[in-house]
Design a protein with these regions (language model features):
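Short, functional N-terminal and low-complexity linear motifs
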Residues: 2-6, 24-26, 57, 139-148
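Active-site-facing alpha/beta catalytic cores
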Residues: 2-17, 22-28, 176, 180-192
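Active-site core of metal-dependent hydrolases
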Residues: 8-127
């Protein structure tokens, strides 16, 4: 039996599983949206005041698409991808359970990196590392999991992934390109 509901075209569903502009506008207040946009567009640090609202919005958006878990997704130096999956479900004793993603858990994840593959790059006892959300790459939902793009660094600040050096390079190129453009009388907030 054929459904009476019309099938959506690829153009209508394009970007549906990405926490992009349309989802941000729908799930965030205007003030928080503007602050997050500045973070993304200008490479600014995320305002800690908005992290809880962004986390709640991202969680609600992901759940609406069938997600039950989230992971800080990164590319370690091993040439693979990695992430630790966490459930949104959080038990509350006698009261049952709630679905939760805190601002802190959105911004920083996995304080003990001993569970991540290293290809012998470090000893397990030196495995204290952190994932940090990279808001310049959009979060997305795939197969019931919210993937939060992240960088991976050691507790001493050493890069343990392939993305952090790329982001540093983009920042350096942006700074120098803006400097050169200024010499020619053009100013801008961001080039890349």
């Amino acid at each position: 039996m054929e459904s009476t509901k019309e099938k959506a075209t690829p153009a209508e569903t394009f970007g549906e599983y990405i926490f992009g502009d349309a989802a941000m506008k729908k799930y965030l207040t205007a003030k928080t949206y503007d602050s997050l946009r500045r973070t993304i567009d200008e490479g600014k640090q995320i305002d800690p005041e908005i992290s809880a609202e962004v986390a709640e919005a991202m969680k609600n958006w992901a759940i609406s698409l069938g997600a039950t878990h989230y992971t800080h997704w990164f590319q370690p130096l091993t040439g693979t991808t990695a992430g630790k999956h966490e459930a949104f479900l959080d038990f509350c004793g006698k009261d049952g359970a709630i679905m939760r993603l805190s601002g802190k858990n959105l911004v920083v994840g996995e304080p003990d990196a001993s569970s991540f593959p290293t290809d012998g790059a470090r000893a397990t006892c030196a495995a204290r590392g952190y994932t940090a959300w990279d808001p310049t790459s959009p979060a997305f939902v795939k197969e019931g999991t919210l993937f939060i793009p992240a960088v991976f660094v050691s507790y001493t600040g050493e890069t343990l992934d392939k993305k952090a050096p790329l982001l540093k390079s983009i920042t350096a190129l942006n700074t120098q390109t803006k400097r050169i453009l200024k010499l020619f009388g053009t100013s801008c907030k961001k080039v890349f």
